[in-house]
Amino acid sequence: SEENAFFQISPVSESYLNYFNDINHDFSYVRDYMKRINSYLISEYHIDGFRFDLTKGFTNKNIAENYVSSRVDYLKMIANDIRDVDEDNYIIFEHFQGFEEKIFSDYGILTWGEENYNYNEATMGYASDLSGISYKKRGFKNPTLIGFMESHDKERLMYKNLEYGNSSGSYDIKHFDNAMGRMEAAGAFFFTVPGPKMIWQFGELGYNISINQCPDGSISEDCRVSNKQSAFQLDMDKGIK
């Protein structure tokens, strides 16, 4: 209802940052609620880390892309509350706001480092800049950037290799073996860069089922959350060298 102090019927911050009703992050009871939930998960279930989704939306300000000092202070407070329970707990923010990410890095907080487009351009055989995977490129002093090539939000590299891969003479990236070779090469320019990395499920096997594949095999964004066969159901693990 409109009287609910915890949830706002109409999100205050920018609409693309909100899904369903928006939590009123400025309300003191909400902040205490967050503190108690995180503390309980650590003490009761021994959770060793948290990844907070879309932390850029942890504000009632309608200027999410700008620097918001109150948001930074609030997120630091969440980190402090977690560390009061377990000082070694992993804290990850999916934030995507460059200046604030530098502040969080200096504070020992890990941040999400998406490089799907650039790596996929490279694996498909097109010119690309992979330097964004480096924490130094983003101006961080500490290796707190969790780099990734694929995620639950992004298309599979191998799928696009096979669909849109470049070619030169007899060499065609749409050929499966060549496409897999490109994935191996991408790994060499991914894992060797200092800093933590995230491998999205089955990415290490060259999983090539589109994120948008429908149960009937067609491709549509309406099927983004449709069930997909696992790599084990498809025997992809049988080809590991």
Where are these regions (language model features)?
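Short, functionally important structural connectors and interaction interfaces within domains
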Residues: 15-17, 141, 175, 197
